[in-house]
């Protein structure tokens, strides 16, 4: 039986910041959930309508609703997303490298719950972009239909994760139906908890698109930490898993992980593609160097030129993971100091995206140098020398060029603060009236 939403004064259960994870939904704690509100206040997808684009929409969609919402351009400062390209632009023709953007995000928020999705199409091209958008559509359509059309709302955290896991299968089928390519996918459901003011964050991900929580009291923690071994070196070129036709019609679910944590009102849950997360890794940002690695497949091989690692510390993989989280925190706190306000979901997206855009600027400038594109006669030896100089300059410049996306949600019951303020105002008004009456 699904519990009713209780008044704040009756809430009793509190949870800590621990993260649970496993291959299946049964490997995380079973916690009872409260009733899900159907009152929608935000539904936003991008870029360019994201899951609601014409190539993805199902011909059976209701005229007024696509994947459970009437509009996918209904954003809010508590529910927001951004998607940009960090790649260079041709200085003469204006064409962007890496186009079209193959990342996509979607968020659908109701009064006390939220569905968040992010996908990163593997490699470049139209099929990659289509795969990411199809994944969002298939997953979002399934979750919204199950929860709010068929009224089969999850009674527990395990049931919520089971729904998310099945939504991944729906995402995969949609990709195959539309003949898309491969994509990562991270699916998140923020749920009200029975007899508690806390919320459960249920998450299923495959590939290297990750989920995080920013807490004003506890900093940033990664929810999807169980999907990759933070104690081992990793090849940042390998996503670790993907849905879509990897092997015939089969996906690659090697790192698929079900995760659970609990959050408080005011915390911000955010999902990112690796264009954001990798650009906080101290090795990628050239702040540190990796430990010596004999694995030739690693993309973190130790630099060979002495000046590239002079005065830079050597970091173990786990240290790099912790540093990246702390660096994200620093960027958010600096934004709060600058604005003298608490960071909203929208501002958090803006702050992190602006940081990675600024970080990678020197890399873009190297490739956007007009001199590289002037037509002039060069011997093969001169061309080879020029190309090696560009490679060396790029290796020294911080950051990684990629598509970069983020979607964020500020946890809470939408409208609760306004209702509490209204109650206070009514009480104050009644108090004033009572004093006036006694005075007369």
Residue ranges: model-predicted function:
Residues 1-66, 244-440:
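C-terminal catalytic subdomain
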Residues 60-110:
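… and, occasionally, acidic/histidine-rich disordered N-termini of signaling adaptors
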Residues 97-154, 284-285:
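Primarily the active-site beta-strand->alpha-helix module of PP2C/PPM metal-dependent phosphatases
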Residues 98, 119, 129-131, 216-218, ...:
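Short coil/turn segments at secondary-structure boundaries
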Residues 101-104, 135, 151-217, 235-263, ...:
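Catalytic core of PPM/PP2C metal-dependent serine/threonine phosphatase domains
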Residues 116, 204, 268-270:
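Hydrophobic "anchor" residues on beta-strands that sit immediately upstream
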Residues 119-120, 185, 208-209, 270-276, ...:
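DG-centered beta-turn motif at the end of beta-strands
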């Amino acid at each position: 039986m699904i519990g009713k939403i209780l008044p704040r004064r009756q809430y009793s259960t509190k949870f800590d910041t621990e993260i649970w994870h496993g291959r299946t939904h049964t490997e995380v704690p079973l916690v009872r959930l409260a009733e899900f509100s159907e009152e929608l206040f935000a539904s936003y997808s991008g870029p360019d309508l994201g899951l609601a684009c014409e190539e993805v929409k199902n011909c059976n969609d209701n005229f007024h609703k696509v994947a459970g919402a009437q509009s996918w351009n209904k954003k809010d400062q508590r529910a927001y997303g951004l998607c940009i390209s960090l790649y260079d632009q041709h200085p003469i023709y204006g064409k962007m490298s890496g186009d079209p953007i193959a990342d996509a995000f979607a968020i659908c928020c109701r009064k006390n719950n939220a569905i968040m999705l992010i996908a990163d199409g593997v490699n470049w091209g139209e099929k990659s972009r289509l795969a990411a958008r199809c994944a969002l559509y298939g997953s979002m359509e399934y979750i919204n239909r199950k929860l709010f059309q068929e009224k089969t709302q999850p009674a527990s955290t395990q049931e919520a994760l089971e729904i998310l896991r099945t939504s991944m299968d729906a995402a995969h089928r949609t990709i195959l139906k539309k003949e898309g390519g491969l994509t990562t996918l991270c699916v998140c459901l923020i749920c009200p908890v029975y007899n508690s003011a806390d919320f459960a964050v249920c998450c299923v991900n495959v590939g290297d698109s990750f989920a995080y929580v920013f807490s004003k009291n506890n900093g940033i923690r990664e929810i999807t930490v169980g999907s990759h071994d933070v104690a081992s070196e990793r090849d940042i070129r390998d996503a670790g898993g993907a849905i879509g036709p990897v092997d015939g019609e089969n996906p690659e679910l090697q790192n698929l992980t079900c995760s659970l944590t609990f959050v408080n009102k005011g915390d911000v849950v955010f999902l990112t593609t690796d264009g954001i997360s990798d650009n906080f890794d101290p090795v990628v940002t050239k702040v540190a160097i990796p430990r010596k690695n004999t694995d030739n497949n690693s993309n973190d091989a130790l630099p060979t030129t002495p000046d590239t690692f002079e005065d830079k510390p050597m970091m173990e993989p786990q240290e790099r993971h912790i540093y990246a989280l702390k660096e994200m925190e620093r960027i958010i706190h600096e934004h709060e100091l600058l604005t003298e306000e608490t960071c909203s979901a929208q501002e958090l997206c803006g702050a992190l995206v602006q940081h990675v855009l600024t970080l990678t600027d020197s890399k873009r400038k190297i490739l956007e140098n007009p001199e590289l594109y002037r037509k002039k006669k060069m011997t093969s030896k001169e061309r080879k020398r020029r190309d090696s100089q560009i490679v060396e300059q790029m290796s020294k410049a911080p950051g990684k060029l990629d598509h970069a996306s983020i979607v964020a949600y500020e946890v809470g019951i939408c409208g609760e603060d306004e209702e509490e303020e209204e109650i206070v105002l009514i009480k104050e008004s009644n108090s004033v009236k009572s004093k006036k009456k006694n005075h007369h």
